[in-house]
Amino acid sequence: MPAGHGVRARTRDLFARPFRKKGYIPLSTYLRTFKVGDYVDVKVNGAIHKGMPHKFYHGRTGRIWNVTKRAVGVEVNKQIGNRIIRKRIHVRVEHVQQSRCAEEFKLRKKQNDVLKADAKARGETISTKRQPKGPKPGFMVEGMTLETVTPIPYDVVNDLKGGY
């Protein structure tokens, strides 16, 4: 008989709990606050069957568009044929975690705000654009003596007489 195509087909390893992370769910999982617009990673917890998203969304990053008592609405991109569609799914909080994808952006934004405030106090205008890293500066190699290398003439006749 052919293999089944159920909702949880081929998820034996995908939904398995990590080593030494089996057992009870920590309370911090339920005490996290999610706000609309936050980026979250969908990471299915195989121990909790309620509110579990489809296996396609496991490992995807999305943006929260709705917050309810026990779940959050996540908007995830999904490629269907030749187009990308934004899918809206509701997932329980046990199956999502805060994403670190915008961490660097938020840090850079804070640094730019400080730089802009300092520049405004001095009465200057600055550019906060990121610039590509330029070439390394040149340097001189010290303490080296030059040696001229000349090739040895290749003698075909003697090479054939000597054999291998």
From Swiss-Prot:
Record-linked InterPro entries: Ribosomal_eL21, Ribosomal_eL21_CS, Ribosomal_eL21_sf, Translation_prot_SH3-like_sf
Source organism, top-level taxon: Eukaryota
Gene Ontology cellular component list: cytosolic large ribosomal subunit; nucleus
Keyword set includes Ribonucleoprotein: yes
Keyword terms: Ribonucleoprotein, Ribosomal protein
GO MF, one annotated term: structural constituent of ribosome
Family to which this protein belongs: Belongs to the eukaryotic ribosomal protein eL21 family.
Pfam families noted in UniProt: Ribosomal_L21e (PF01157)
Name of the protein: Large ribosomal subunit protein eL21x/eL21w
PROSITE patterns registered for this protein in UniProt: RIBOSOMAL_L21E
Gene Ontology BP annotations: translation
